[in-house]
């Protein structure tokens, strides 16, 4: 049985407003703690990819890679609107990190569409 729910609009449904805001608040805290404007400019100037920040985003405390994975499989159960909202907030911080985050989200699609129990 495929994981994908065939119900119309399922990919848009996603998180309830409170949960979405909680994830957005987490992104804001990440920015405040790790992504000052000076640090982002330093990444650009030195042509550094901030691997440690990506690892933090994907770590057990934040787990942003779980956004689009259904809750039944350990994810957050987010939808396209959630991905858009979070990507938009991240783009205000750093496009490089946003691109990495969105690329990681693309990896959820094959799991949702083709994985079996």
Residue ranges and their predicted role:
Residues 1-101:
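Amphipathic, small/basic residue-rich leader segments at the start of a protein or domain
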Residues 98-117:
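N-terminal glycine-rich flavin-associated loop
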């Amino acid at each position: 049985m495929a994981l994908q729910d065939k119900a119309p609009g399922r990919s848009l449904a996603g998180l309830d407003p409170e949960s979405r805001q909680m994830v957005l608040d987490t992104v804001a805290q990440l920015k405040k703690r790790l992504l000052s404007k000076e640090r982002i400019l330093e990444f650009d100037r030195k042509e550094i990819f901030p691997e440690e920040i990506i690892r933090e985003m994907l770590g057990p405390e934040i787990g942003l890679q779980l956004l689009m994975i259904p809750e039944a499989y350990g994810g957050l159960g987010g939808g396209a609107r959630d991905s858009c909202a979070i990507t938009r907030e991240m783009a205000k911080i750093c496009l490089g990190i946003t691109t990495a985050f969105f690329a990681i989200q693309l990896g959820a699609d094959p799991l949702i569409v083709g994985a079996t129990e």
